[in-house]
Amino acid sequence: MSERVILAYSGGLDTSVAISWIGKETGREVVAVAIDLGQGGEDMEVIRQRALDCGAVEAVVVDARDEFAEGYCLPTIRNNALYMDRYPLVSAISRPLIVKHLVAAAREHGGSTVAHGCTGKGNDQVRFEVGFASLAPDLEVLAPVRDYAWTREKAIAFAEENAIPINVTKRSPFSIDQNVWGRAVETGFLEHLWNAPTKDVYAYTEDPTLNWSTPDEVIVGFERGVPVSIDGKPVSVLGAIEELNARAGAKGVGRLDVVEDRLVGIKSREIYEAPGAMVLITAHTELEHVTLERELGRFKRHTDQRWAELVYDGLWYSPLKAALESFVDKTQEHVTGEIRMVLHGGHIAVNGRRSAESLYDFNLATYDEGDSFDQSAAKGFVYVHGLSSKIASRRDQR
């Protein structure tokens, strides 16, 4: 048996061409691995058969939907992770899981090399290769699209010359990546920052102006930072994401038009759709406002952003990320309760909160009868709190 290459296979043009190209250029057999992350679209069995038709000696489909939701989407929720305060890491959190399964396939199928179809301009090349280096430094990595400067035109020509059974056209307006956590769209006319997205950009969300007269009220319940119910009915993490994708997407919630700082040093425009993700992160953040002590909440907002940056930058397996997650596990001990929201016109409006772990004390907060806050103590507190600023100002005014 010849040396084998384990290929991350999407079923698209580049990775279909890569199967034949790797065989011709290296003489190695290719095992194609397709991961089901809830992306929808083509049936995974169709994708598996396409890989075989393109020349793979074996084609493996892994149903990783629950694993993705529990092990990758859930930490994103608990860390309120929005890169640059906007992007819920739709693609970034999927790459380490794909890496994990490619390494497992390499061990099972005798692979000495892993391969991906990433370009040299994006973040995914880093996420894949740093992941491989972390989990399996003995494996060689092939990146034919990047290392041999493939263009779409070159890939189509190769497919035609070698009778690769895939239907393609030379004009496709967008590059799309999607999974159950969301959908990312880039390139084409979107590369011009002044161009507004057209209707055909979107697939997970409806036009926010539709169904304007019928808002959807939803209650999301959490236990220790984990979403466990919707409108009082128990759900898995995957079930919560899927239901909220449908309900929030129908109200146009989760559309994001972002210019982001890529790891490779350039700025890139991306259109994201993440209805379920944005509802869950919004609800979780709001519940933390109710249940976390002030200093803990302030500090966690810093670690949330750092966690998002580490994941975006491909450092899923880093010691710092692991340490931050140990911290976050501790913070979630009291993040239990329910958040009520109205989904309407592309917006999420929180209008109710309840928790047995709440730090909100009505008697301390009220300005009406029953007020138990000792306002007479405030005068001395204000004096001491502002004393250092008062002394500094006195000096600076000399």
Swiss-Prot record:
Binding of L-aspartate occurs at 119, 123-124
Where's it mainly located?
A: cytoplasm
Q: Top-level EC class, please?
A: ligase
Q: Which family does it belong to?
A: Belongs to the argininosuccinate synthase family. Type 1 subfamily.
Database matches in PROSITE patterns: ARGININOSUCCIN_SYN_1, ARGININOSUCCIN_SYN_2
NCBIfam families named among the record's database cross-references: argG, PRK00509.1
Q: Name one GO molecular function term.
A: ATP binding
Listed under catalytic activity are:
L-citrulline + L-aspartate + ATP = 2-(N(omega)-L-arginino)succinate + AMP + diphosphate + H(+)
Sequence positions that bind L-citrulline:
87, 123, 127, 175, 260, 272
Give the subcellular location: Cytoplasm
Annotated EC:
6.3.4.5
InterPro entries, per the entry: Arginosuc_syn_C (IPR048268), Arginosuc_syn_N (IPR048267), Arginosuc_synth (IPR001518), Arginosuc_synth_CS (IPR018223), Arginosuc_synth_type_1_subfam (IPR023434), AS_cat/multimer_dom_body (IPR024074), Rossmann-like_a/b/a_fold (IPR014729)
Q: Give the protein's recorded name.
A: Argininosuccinate synthase
Instruction: Tell me which CDD domains the record gives.
Output: ASS
Chain sites annotated for binding ATP: 8-16, 117
Q: In which pathway does it act?
A: Amino-acid biosynthesis; L-arginine biosynthesis; L-arginine from L-ornithine and carbamoyl phosphate: step 2/3
**What Gene3D superfamilies does this protein map onto?**
Argininosuccinate synthetase, chain A, domain 2, HUPs, Single helix bin
Q: Which GO terms describe its biological process?
A: argininosuccinate metabolic process; L-arginine biosynthetic process; urea cycle
Q: Which GO terms describe its cellular component?
A: cytoplasm
User: What does the annotation say about its assembly with partners?
Assistant: Homotetramer.
Q: Which UniProt keywords apply?
A: Amino-acid biosynthesis, Arginine biosynthesis, ATP-binding, Cytoplasm, Ligase, Nucleotide-binding
